[in-house]
Regions:
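Acidic, surface-exposed loops and disordered segments
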Residues: 1-244
Length: 244
C-alpha cells in the first residue's frame, strides 16, 4: 500500500494553480437554483445606466465555464458597451432584416428564398415578414424594439469551421450568462434578430465588430439594469417527456 501526501498527484493537462478546490459552503440548494431559473425573465426596459466593467467580467466568468463539446471551449465574446454603440448594431440589424424580408414581396424572390432556406425555413420567415418589417419601421422612426436601447450587448462567437456544435457551445454559454446576470441584478434578453440580420444581411454586423471572416455570431444578449422588477413568474407548458 502506498501513501501519498496531500497534493502529490499532478496531471499534464492541469498545471499547478489551474485546479481550484470547490467551496461547498457556496453551493446553492436545488430549490435555490430552481428559483433562480423560474424567476429569470426577459427584460426589455433598461435604466439609463452603464453596466460596470467588473460586473460584465463576472457575467463572462460564468459564461466561459459553460460546458462544451469535447471540452473545446470554443466560444469567444465581443462586448459592445454604451447605448450609442449598441444602437449602431441595432441599425445594422434593421438593414439586415429589411434585406432578408424584401424578397418575400415577390414570387421570384420567395422561390429563391425557399432554395436558400429550405421550404420550412422560408415559410416561417414569410409568416413573420410583416411583423419584422414593422419592427424595422419602428426602429427607423425612433422606437427601438430590436436592441431595446440597451447599454450593453454581448455577442457569442466561434470559428465556424469547428462544426455545428459551435452553436450549441455558444448557446450553453448564453444560458450561463443570463443566470449570472439575473443573480447580479441585471436584466437580459436574447437578441436573435442580431444573428439573423447578420446571416442574411451580408455579414455587416460581423464586419462592424471586426469579427474574423472564419468566425460566426452564434448568440447575442442585450443587457442592462432593468427599469422594472418582476415579483412573480408565470407557469410554463408541462414538459413533454417520454420515459423509456
Amino acid at each position: 500500500m502506498s501513501i501519498c501526501p496531500s497534493g502529490a498527484i499532478s496531471h499534464s493537462h492541469f498545471p499547478e494553480g489551474t485546479v481550484t478546490p470547490t467551496r461547498s459552503e457556496y453551493l446553492p440548494t436545488y430549490d435555490q437554483v430552481l428559483e433562480l431559473i423560474h424567476s429569470r425573465r426577459s427584460k426589455r426596459l433598461f435604466r439609463d445606466k452603464p453596466v460596470e466593467r467588473d460586473v460584465i467580467e463576472k457575467v463572462l466568468e460564468a459564461a466561459r465555464f459553460a460546458p462544451s463539446g469535447h471540452n473545446e471551449q470554443t466560444t469567444e465574446f465581443i462586448v459592445v458597451q454604451g447605448k450609442e454603440n449598441v444602437h449602431e448594431i441595432g441599425a445594422l440589424t434593421a438593414k439586415g432584416i429589411r434585406r432578408m424580408v424584401m424578397p418575400f414581396r415577390y414570387a421570384i424572390g420567395r422561390m429563391m428564398m425557399r432554395l436558400m432556406m429550405g421550404s420550412r425555413g422560408a415559410e416561417y420567415v414569410a409568416k413573420l415578414a410583416p411583423e419584422m418589417e414593422g419592427l424595422v419601421d419602428l426602429f427607423n422612426s425612433g422606437t427601438d424594439w430590436l436592441v431595446r436601447d440597451a447599454p450593453l450587448l454581448i455577442l457569442f462567437c466561434a470559428d465556424s469551421a469547428g462544426g455545428s456544435h459551435m452553436s450549441i457551445n455558444a448557446n450553453l454559454a448564453v444560458q450561463n450568462a443570463t443566470l449570472a446576470a439575473e443573480a447580479l441584478g441585471l436584466g437580459s434578453m436574447y437578441a436573435g434578430f442580431v444573428m439573423t440580420a447578420n446571416d442574411y444581411g451580408g455579414g455587416r454586423i460581423a464586419k462592424h465588430v471586426s469579427l474574423p471572416e472564419t468566425h460566426k455570431i452564434y448568440g447575442a444578449l442585450i443587457m442592462g439594469y432593468p427599469r422594472l422588477q418582476f415579483k412573480k413568474w408565470p407557469e410554463r407548458n408541462p414538459a413533454k417527456v417520454t420515459w423509456i
